[in-house]
């Protein structure tokens, strides 16, 4: 893992995983240790089965498999999933998070929505299908810790600058391994780009 900086811009190069990328700061000691530990402990995504108890439809399985291949084989960090209303996007994301957690590719997940009702829906989906992930609704449970955090964009903007009593940021730039953006259209990206750049 290589960090390089000119004092104004910071770049991270995980030389075994992906191309260099600009980051908003340095990882904490714990975040770095996890990044290095994953080099030897993560499983091949193709060797881990999609949980059929979470997603039952063939196209959900195909979407998760394609995203896994995109991350693993193509060494990409971003993916776009487009599904019709009622097609099971939230459950697909829950199953993807489950797969990445079981393969040791992800420890913590951030799920961002534009409305509180969608936050509640996503938290309930994680509680139902992945209860061991300890889903946290950041809109109502702001002081809790878990593996899955669900928030509105507006709430997360405030949480980025939140500090713990010991003076460290609550959410460092390397805190989340998977960030899910629900309803990722241009107006959301333009308005809340700071969140996406930070993580």
Predicted regions and their residues:
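ATP-dependent helicase/translocase motor core
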Residues: 1-108, 113, 117-133, 144-148, ...
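SF2 helicase catalytic motif II
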Residues: 167-199
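Activation segment
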Residues: 157-160, 188
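Short alpha-helical segments and helix-capping/turn motifs at coil-helix boundaries
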Residues: 133-137, 141, 187-193
């Amino acid at each position: 893992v290589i960090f390089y900086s000119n004092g104004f811009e910071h770049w991270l190069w995980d030389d075994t995983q992906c191309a260099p990328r600009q980051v908003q700061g340095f990882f904490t000691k714990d975040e770095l240790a996890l990044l290095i530990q994953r080099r030897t402990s993560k499983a091949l995504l193709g060797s881990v089965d999609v949980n059929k108890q979470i997603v039952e439809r063939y196209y959900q399985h195909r979407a998760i498999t394609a995203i896994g291949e995109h991350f693993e084989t193509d060494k990409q960090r971003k993916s776009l999933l487009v599904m019709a209303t009622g097609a099971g996007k939230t459950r697909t994301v829950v199953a993807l998070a489950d797969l990445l957690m079981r393969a040791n590719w992800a420890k913590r997940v951030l799920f961002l929505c534009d409305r509180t009702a969608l936050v509640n829906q996503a938290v309930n989906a994680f509680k139902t299908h992945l209860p061991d992930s300890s889903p946290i609704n950041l809109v109502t449970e702001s002081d809790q810790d878990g593996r899955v955090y669900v928030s509105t964009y507006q709430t997360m903007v405030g949480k980025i600058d939140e500090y713990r009593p010991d003076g460290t940021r609550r959410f460092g730039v390397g805190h989340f391994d998977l960030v899910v953006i629900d309803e990722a259209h241009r107006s959301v990206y333009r308005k809340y780009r700071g969140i996406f750049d930070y993580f």
